[in-house]
Amino acid sequence: MHPRKSTKILNKKHKGGQRRTRKNGMKSLHPNYSNTTKSHLVRVFLEILNMVKLYHWKTHSYAQHKATDELYASMNEHVDKFIEVLLGKDTKRIKMMEKKIDLIDPTNLSDFKSRIYEYREFLTDMNLYFNEKADMDILAIRDDLLMDINQFLYLMTFNK
């Protein structure tokens, strides 16, 4: 079902009071946050934060240096809040399944911005995995991360 369909259709119950899931076309009101999912989110968040900090140290532009510094600080705060809220949903700690993270080392601004666009798409796709009703807190923090990225991309349009 397309995510933009009316909430009336999305909230309609089927036989046995079931809600739509990916398998039966409905979403559960009580989502299961698997350890694998949490571990993957942590890995992606750490990779992007490290990439931003690395580019921050490498750039020769003072404006980019300041913009990446602000992006890192804001994203770091929002990532921390995102993971803590996610952990609070089921009170289970993360056992990292993915023990290695990639150190993404963009060679130039174009490569760096391309990675930022990919990360933005990763964030927008979270709507597919989180329940809009049960996870509105997590998705609100995700929106804060998107705001950080979009503001940063605007700042990157300046010449100096």
Stretch-by-stretch model annotation:
Residues M1-S34:
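Arg/Lys-rich, intrinsically disordered low-complexity tails that mediate electrostatic binding
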